Amino acid sequence: MADDGSASNRRDPIKSSVGNVAGQRRRKQAVTVAKERRELLVRAKRLCRVGTNGDVEDALVENEMMVDEEQPILEAQASKSVEELKSAVQYQGKGAMQKRVTALRELRRLLSKSEFPPVEAALRAGAIPLLVQCLSFGSPDEQLLESAWCLTNIAAGKPEETKALLPALPLLIAHLGEKSSAPVAEQCAWAIGNVAGEGEDLRNVLLSQGALPPLARMIFPDKGSTVRTAAWALSNLIKGPESKAAAQLVKIDGILDAILRHLKKTDEETATEIAWIIVYLSALSDIATSMLLKGGILQLLIDRLATSSSLQLLIPVLRSLGNFVAVDPKAVLTILIREQNTEESIIGVLAKCLRSEHRVLKKEAAWVLSNIAAGSIEHKRMIHSTEVMPLLLRILSTSPFDIRKEVAYVLGNLCVESAEGDRKPRIIQEHLVSIVSGGCLRGFIELVRSPDIEAARLGLQFIELVLRGMPNGEGPKLVEGEDGIDAMERFQFHENEELRVMANSLVDKYFGEDYGIDE
């Protein structure tokens, strides 16, 4: 189900019940995460410089050959290399196979050795039909591997260069099968992963040609490199915005067991690739989400958070955890109760991430906590009773804006019970007093002053809680003491009607003509 763009990027803070817009939020997150993922980890496409056959000697030669050369020289060499490949393909005499492999290897080296490989020149010279011909069934493994490697690096190029692989896709998919050698299958999976990383249209072509089942079966064995490559390609193939591929993947017998096994037992690099599959499954497939929860996914994710320091792994693990929290808060509550107040508890591992120096990690951890804090009164009490509270209050006053905003969602949600519709939420006064006493009000008023509409709304909502909920009517004085009146008055003629009405109503109600008259 593609997001229509109208859904909130997270459940509406303070006013909504847990899960109210969780499904929409998870689907939208799956659409946007691909861009973030490329920016943070440069993962959508990968140039292959060292092959999948484990040939160390070849890798060393490759490294020696990686010298900076003028682009025109590289392009001329690429054109010449394609012509030599064309001659080798046509040659039928003695040593024909070795002649083809030598020509393929030379083209592959040219497509691997530069930061900007001469892909366009190779395509103009007619490389694709020749590479497709070299992928034909019955060809020696060495020829298949070199051809798939060339196609992998072509697919890592510009969009139009990636699309040039369309004629090769059926054979690349066919070589994913069990009859292929592991290096050949892995190299073909790599090429397919690059194609899938280009965009939705090419993903749909791959799905229609049957790429998903053989790719999924490649993660069943415990073969590290093959599993990593196949899992990365799978995550590119299912990442949305449509849920069709995720729904198809979860129907493959044994796939969820394999995902859980690898997340639990494999090295961090493999677990990272598996975790990105979980991100998209938990965002796009309710069936997969339910089945993974039954398989104990939450505890596995928490265990990875507790034991890993790898940013590349922790980001998808946190993203997955937040998705599961949004869809099944009861499962999270069970774990909260069982492991409360320990470093290995869900709150403990999220606190660990909040203490990290990595900005993205802090933001992701705060987002997960905001999902938990938007749950039941039990969820809120469990968070409020832990060591994470002083940490959240400190972050609200010291961190960059985007992290402060995420933390503000946590603190705001801790102060109210979940409410349905337009009804004002009931304030949890004990939490509100504690959080305000911790010095958070200034941080929320700073959000009101920000140009970010979402943050300003959140700040105004919290001010309303303070004005309405602090005991002995002390809310207005507290807000005034932090220059909250001035912050709200900036909305007197604001173009956003919702914020204008909200701010003006609060000023009129709590700071009208009679304000301060009894002092």
Swiss-Prot record:
Give a Pfam family name: Arm
Q: List the Gene3D superfamilies.
A: Leucine-rich Repeat Variant
The Gene Ontology CC terms held by the record are: cytoplasm; nuclear envelope
Q: What InterPro entries has UniProt attached to this entry?
A: ARM-like, ARM-type_fold, Armadillo, Importin_alpha
Provide this UniProt record's keywords sorted from A to Z: Nucleus, Protein transport, Repeat, Transport
Name a biological process GO annotation: protein import into nucleus
Give the ARM repeat ranges: 116-156, 158-197, 200-239, 244-283, 286-326, 335-374, 377-416, 429-468
Q: Which GO terms describe its molecular function?
A: nuclear import signal receptor activity
**Cellular location of this protein?**
Nucleus envelope
Identify the main location. nucleus
Positions of region (Disordered)? 1-29
Q: Which proteins does it associate with, and in what oligomeric form? A: Forms a complex with importin subunit beta-1.
What is the annotated role of this protein in its UniProt record? Answer: Binds to conventional NLS motifs and mediates nuclear protein import across the nuclear envelope. Acts as a cellular receptor for the nuclear import of the virD2 protein of Agrobacterium, but is not essential for Agrobacterium-mediated root transformation.
The entry sums up its family as follows: Belongs to the importin alpha family.
Protein's name according to its UniProt entry: Importin subunit alpha-9
- What's the source species for this entry? Arabidopsis thaliana
Lineage of producing organism? Eukaryota, Viridiplantae, Streptophyta, Embryophyta, Tracheophyta
